[in-house]
């Protein structure tokens, strides 16, 4: 009997410790928020550094191609959010809808700035930077809203949001790399 009692007390203690550790651990959406803030800062700093070099045709071409790929990724992210809307409800659904609308607006602004890259390289660079920053901010805001509302919804939506965000970041990093290569050739 004493052995059972000791076992039960040990099991309860282990469960209590696990609960404490679990509460202290960050959620995937909190990790996403933190990463988004760091990525946004790095992307802005590097883009500004690249554009302080000479404006050459090669850099402008890389800027246009980067803008194209960010535009495609913005559309993919908006599409992923639309799919996630089907699994959401309440405040999470409202946040997803607002984020998707804002991303579509950002994509449209980037699309309008696109045609005359040679003449408007500076404006396109600014729009590209704004598009990336807006996307990161919208994702952060979405993560906060979803994370603060429903743990059950969070479990369903967190992987979808994180996956879409990770795809966006990979594409934005590729843009950074190409712009860096173009700026280095000058």
Curated annotation (Swiss-Prot):
Propeptide: 19-23
Keyword presence, Secreted: yes
Main location group: secreted
Keywords: Antibiotic, Antimicrobial, Cleavage on pair of basic residues, Immunity, Innate immunity, Lipid transport, Secreted, Signal, Transport
TM spans (from-to): none
Induction (free text): By bacterial infection.
Compartment(s) of residence: Secreted
GO terms for cellular component: extracellular space
Gene Ontology annotations of biological process type: defense response to Gram-positive bacterium; innate immune response; lipid transport
Keyword Phosphoprotein: no
Signal sequence bounds: 1-18
One MF term in the entry's GO annotations: lipid binding
Expression sites (tissue/organ): Expressed in hemolymph. Also found in hemocytes and fat body.
Coiled-coil annotated residue ranges, if any: none
Function noted in UniProt: Assists in the loading of diacylglycerol, generated from triacylglycerol stores in the fat body through the action of adipokinetic hormone, into lipophorin, the hemolymph lipoprotein. It increases the lipid carrying capacity of lipophorin by covering the expanding hydrophobic surface resulting from diacylglycerol uptake. It thus plays a critical role in the transport of lipids during flight in several species of insects. Has antibacterial activity against the Gram-positive bacteria L.monocytogenes (MIC=6.5 uM).
Oligomeric and partner information: Equilibrium between a soluble monomer and a bound lipoprotein form. Apolipophorin-3 associates with lipophorin during lipid loading until each particle contains 9 or 14 molecules of apolipophorin-3.
Family: Belongs to the insect apolipophorin-3 family.
Name of the protein in question: Apolipophorin-3
Annotated organism of origin: Galleria mellonella (Greater wax moth)
